[in-house]
Amino acid sequence: MTPRKAAQRTVLLVVHTGRDEATETARRVKKIVGDNGIALRVLSAEAVDRGSLHLALDNMRAMGVDIEVVDADPHVAQGCELVLVLGGDGTFLRAAELARTARIPVLGVNLGRIGFLAEAEAEAIDVVLEHVIARSYRVEERLTLDIVVRQGGNIIDQGWALNEASLEKGPRLGVLGVVVEIEGRPVSTFGCDGVLVSTPTGSTAYAFSAGGPVLWPDLEAILVVPNNAHALFGRPMVTSPDATVAIELEANGNDALVFCDGRREMIIPAGGRLEVTRCATPVKWARLDSAPFTDRLVSKFRLPVTGWRGK
């Protein structure tokens, strides 16, 4: 196929096609942005995953909307100005990987349950699109993590994470014996089910479920949360964003797994070492809401605030 000339403005649309409301919301996106001369890029797997979404694409093309269907590729967002996400937090994390590679902002519209990473709910899609068309969103940079697995001093695998790196024992295996090291110094040795190393963005995700504190996203820090540690000092720790956090597995123990944002998996052999540092490439986050993070925390977790009188 002969590549067509790139449109002046292009938005990559990433959709959770398993949700019933995704097709109608995507159709609304295509109609509004198409009417304003913005081209859409859609992943081929999503275009054919649901028949109704595929039909919507054909209908929009017939109406003159510029739609490009492309195969999944790490560089698929190159040439786009924004990645627009319709889905939950899992879909957002998938889209953030594409946006980070292209170094463009990612904007989430929640179709899931909590949608902590999303900027708006599905019913506000028209308002979201007004901001996209006018480019009236602001862009924040969110800290990400570089993740390296070593064995005998050699790098055997590496990755990155926006939310967290989760060190976990394998299925049906015993407790992991680990040594936690921060800034090149040992902190504690203990047995555990795993250890999470999280960003402030990820502090409301798996790290929160494991007993970690909530960190405001504009705080620059790295959070270390032992998971079911058999130790007197098995408490979460908040470190400098410039610290190197390392976790060593005991040499005569079991292999372990590392999950980056619950998506990308690596294996750490017994005696191996996990190193986590701040990554030089952040995720660019498109923001519409000027309300403080406190409001989002209360809303998403449905925290009781009855009786508050304020100033």
Swiss-Prot record:
The active site is at D89 (proton acceptor). GO terms for biological process: NAD metabolic process; NADP biosynthetic process. The keyword ATP-binding applies. NAD(+) binds at D89, G90, R94, N163, E164, D193, T204, A205, Y206, A207, F208, S209. GO terms for cellular component: cytoplasm. Its EC number is 2.7.1.23. GO terms for molecular function: ATP binding; metal ion binding; NAD binding; NAD+ kinase activity. Pfam families: NAD_kinase, NAD_kinase_C. Gene3D superfamilies: Probable inorganic polyphosphate/atp-NAD kinase, domain 1 (3.40.50.10330), Probable inorganic polyphosphate/atp-NAD kinase, domain 2 (2.60.200.30). Its cofactor is a divalent metal cation. Keywords: ATP-binding, Cytoplasm, Kinase, NAD, NADP, Nucleotide-binding, Transferase. Involved in the regulation of the intracellular balance of NAD and NADP, and is a key enzyme in the biosynthesis of NADP. Catalyzes specifically the phosphorylation on 2'-hydroxyl of the adenosine moiety of NAD to yield NADP. NCBIfam families: PRK03372.1. This is NAD kinase. The gene is nadK.
